[in-house]
Amino acid sequence: MRTHYCGDVRLRDVGTTVTLYGWVDRRRDHGGVIFIDLRDRSGIVQIVSDPQRTPDAYPQAERLRSEYVVKVVGRVSKRPADSVNPKLATGDIEIYADGIEVLNTVRQQLPFAISSTENEEVREEVRLRYRYLDLRRERMARNLRLRHRVVQAMRRFLEDEAGFIEVETPILTRSTPEGARDYLVPSRVNPGEWFALPQSPQLFKQLLMVAGCDRYYQIAHCFRDEDLRADRQPEFTQLDMEMSFMDQEEILDLNEALICHIFKTVKGIELPRPFPRLSYQEAMDRYGTDKPDTRYGLELVDVSDILKDSGFKVFSGAIAQGGVVKILPIPNGSDRISNVRIKPGGDLFQEATTAGAKGLAYIRVRNNGEIDTIGAIKDNLSPEQKALLLERTGAQPGHLLLFGAGETATVNKTLDRLRQTIAREFNLIDPTATHLLWVVDFPMFEWNAEEKRLEALHHPFTAPHPEDLGDLKTARAQAYDLIFNGHEVGGGSLRIHQPELQRQVFEIIGIDEATAQEKFGFLLEAFEFGTPPHGGIAYGLDRLVMLLAGADSIRDTIAFPKTQQARCLLTGAPSSVEPQQLKELHVTPAKPAKTTAKTKPRPAD
């Protein structure tokens, strides 16, 4: 019977006999004495097999190799002072093995080194193909433990401190409009009809409020068939919450307490309260994004009023057509960023055009205070306009001013992208800093140019500000996002709880009465039976853990993630299925299914 985990043995255990199980992380033979680093999920401990002191265990120690599974029985000893390893939690002790039992061996060449001492860079495709081995590695095991501790902290706060109850909502539900693409599941017993996997528990958690649940939470699995990137997965996990009889201030206050509890429990960080707040409009004006990273400055400056009558038509024309001109002021940028990078073919020009800009104008403030720019700008701005630009932006000698001119959304996207690029290049981001803030007062709707209609900026169940009820199309939403170092980690709102108002919102986004009844009739009917005021929030667990772990991708914080092509390299999913299965489901494929078999990666050298 195991007495200890490997990483838990300490000086207090010196003189006792312990029984450990684990994997051989590393084996070393020093002058006939064999040293074994034994690893389990808790960490590593050093095992010593000395033929003079423990002759019975020595033959087994000789045959050990990396990743053999073993049982070790031995006596805990204090290490000599010159062999203490401060890098290990168990570095003050070692265990002299009285007995070693090999429980399993490795029958194939390892595709990559597991031991952290090897410090081997492994291609992600290989890691995902052999994910069960990747999860043995220290960094990945640490991420899984961190994820567990975050969820544990969430549960304890919500249940013990805030009176929430956990309720599971259905995985098989119905497809509804106004979201990403659904994953669909055909019904065998109802031919021609389909379930959808939930993109969120939104409607069910609102129904739980109608049911009198009052305070609900769930660690919910959600599914969205959308294009993937570094922090997106087709299936993901969120902390889902809903509360009755609470206004926005009460919800934000409770959630700040929750986040502070998580950070203190998991990272030992005391967060100051209350969290800063920005309105959506202020965030867009100052940073060009509704999820600004406030660990550094580089705020945008609107200079449209200064340049609306300028002779430079790129500026004045953009403003005349309803657009804006903004500046990204970069201290010390004049000497550090060359013209080559700003002009066509340069990396900053490419960043700007990728975001939709047609070009990238600039002004340099030389060390002598003189302005340097292209002739078309220098010749078409008055001395007063030049002086006002320098005053408005606070430009000093050495500043570089990058301009965005055009449609507001494009300008914001361009300068936000450049702001992030410059911050990384100039090392302006403190990786140890923790900046959290709320973004509030989002618009209820945004214009979808492709479909030529208004659509809900968040979702159509978000309640408008009471003072904006006179014109819902321009109303602000009672919505809020939590931003952590430039990443949205949570978002929520107060909900509509009156059926008449809900129907008005549906109508604005193009859902007529017949469609509303077909898709959401059950919700509208529930609202007829005394629905309490309610609101909620959902946190992206995968993304939150990624940021807490300092990982580059949420794939590093999920046990078995999909690739950016929505494939599981370990199991080969998605895969073709037998024709009989499709027949039973009354599904006819549009074309023959292609094989999804992948070439097995070669073991690493």
Swiss-Prot record:
The record marks 30 as: Important for tRNA non-discrimination. Coiled coil: none annotated. GO terms for biological process: aspartyl-tRNA aminoacylation. GO terms for cellular component: cytoplasm. It comes from the Bacteria. The keyword Aminoacyl-tRNA synthetase applies. It is an enzyme of class 6 (ligase). InterPro entries: Aa-tRNA-synt_II, aa-tRNA-synth_II, aa-tRNA-synth_II/BPL/LPL, Asp-tRNA-ligase_1, Asp-tRNA-ligase_1_N, Asp/Asn-tRNA-synth_IIb, AspRS_core, GAD-like_sf. It holds the Pfam family tRNA-synt_2. Residues 202-205 are annotated as: Aspartate. Keywords: Aminoacyl-tRNA synthetase, ATP-binding, Cytoplasm, Ligase, Nucleotide-binding, Protein biosynthesis. One of its GO terms (molecular function) is aspartate-tRNA ligase activity. Its EC number is 6.1.1.23. ATP binds at residues 224-226, 233, 488, 540-543. It is found in: Cytoplasm. L-aspartate binds at residues 178, 224, 458, 495. It catalyses: tRNA(Asx) + L-aspartate + ATP = L-aspartyl-tRNA(Asx) + AMP + diphosphate. PANTHER family: ASPARTATE--TRNA LIGASE, MITOCHONDRIAL, ASPARTYL/LYSYL-TRNA SYNTHETASE. HAMAP family: Asp_tRNA_synth_type1 (MF_00044). Aspartyl-tRNA synthetase with relaxed tRNA specificity since it is able to aspartylate not only its cognate tRNA(Asp) but also tRNA(Asn). Reaction proceeds in two steps: L-aspartate is first activated by ATP to form Asp-AMP and then transferred to the acceptor end of tRNA(Asp/Asn). Belongs to the class-II aminoacyl-tRNA synthetase family. Type 1 subfamily. Homodimer. This is Aspartate--tRNA(Asp/Asn) ligase. It comes from Thermosynechococcus vestitus (strain NIES-2133 / IAM M-273 / BP-1). The lineage of its organism: Bacteria, Bacillati, Cyanobacteriota, Cyanophyceae, Acaryochloridales. The gene is aspS.
